[in-house]
């Protein structure tokens, strides 16, 4: 049972861009099929691939962050998770709410690797410039994007028995 749960969606323009790319690819395929005089037995394959890719992309544009009594779980994907990162609370040495620069520090939003405060860091984010910085026992560093970074930092630190730095 989660003690903290946050659902984040990417900004609306990302969905519109994905839809435009999807329908543009389908339209281009239809024009090519019609201009070549109809389809052969395998003409449906590019359309099916575009449809499948479109569903996968739309699915990925959703991020859920949960804190339970024993772990922090970040999941990318709404209908079927395509990426899940689990961090045991016992492995967390430091927790603090931070403001970062997604484009400069991480190269954008999503599942990213970049630099934060001069050291390598993994980023899991969907929107905005606020998140929770985690320093892990194995030396890895992680920033989890959040629209409510202070509440997430408080939940993680409370369950991990640490003091949150907000």
Predicted features along the sequence, with ranges:
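N-terminal membrane-targeting/pre-transmembrane regions
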Residues: 1-39, 139-141, 154-155, 166
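Transmembrane alpha-helices and immediately adjacent membrane-cytoplasm interface residues
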Residues: 49-64
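Alpha-helical transmembrane signal-anchor/signal-peptide segments
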Residues: 65-72
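Hydrophobic alpha-helical transmembrane segments
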Residues: 38-50
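Short aromatic/basic micro-patch
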Residues: 66, 86, 143-146
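A composition-biased, non-transmembrane "mature-region" signal
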Residues: 82, 98, 152-154, 163-166
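Non-transmembrane, membrane-adjacent beta-strand/coil modules in membrane-associated proteins
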Residues: 75-140
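Terminal membrane-proximal soluble interaction domains of membrane-associated proteins
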Residues: 131-138, 142-157
């Amino acid at each position: 049972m989660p003690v903290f749960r946050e659902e984040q969606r990417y900004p609306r323009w990302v969905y519109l861009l994905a839809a435009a790319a999807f329908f543009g690819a389908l339209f281009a395929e239809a024009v090519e099929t019609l201009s070549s005089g109809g389809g052969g037995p395998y003409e449906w394959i590019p359309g099916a691939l575009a449809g499948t890719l479109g569903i996968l992309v739309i699915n990925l544009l959703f991020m859920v962050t949960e804190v339970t009594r024993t772990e922090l779980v970040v999941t990318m994907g709404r209908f079927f998770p395509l990426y899940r990162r689990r961090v045991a609370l016992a492995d967390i040495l430091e927790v603090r709410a931070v403001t970062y620069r997604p484009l400069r520090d991480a190269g954008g939003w999503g599942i990213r690797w970049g630099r934060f405060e001069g050291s390598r860091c993994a980023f899991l984010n969907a929107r905005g410039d606020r998140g929770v910085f985690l320093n892990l026992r194995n030396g890895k560093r992680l920033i989890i994007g959040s629209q409510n970074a202070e509440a997430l930092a408080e939940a993680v630190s409370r369950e991990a028995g640490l003091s949150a730095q907000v």
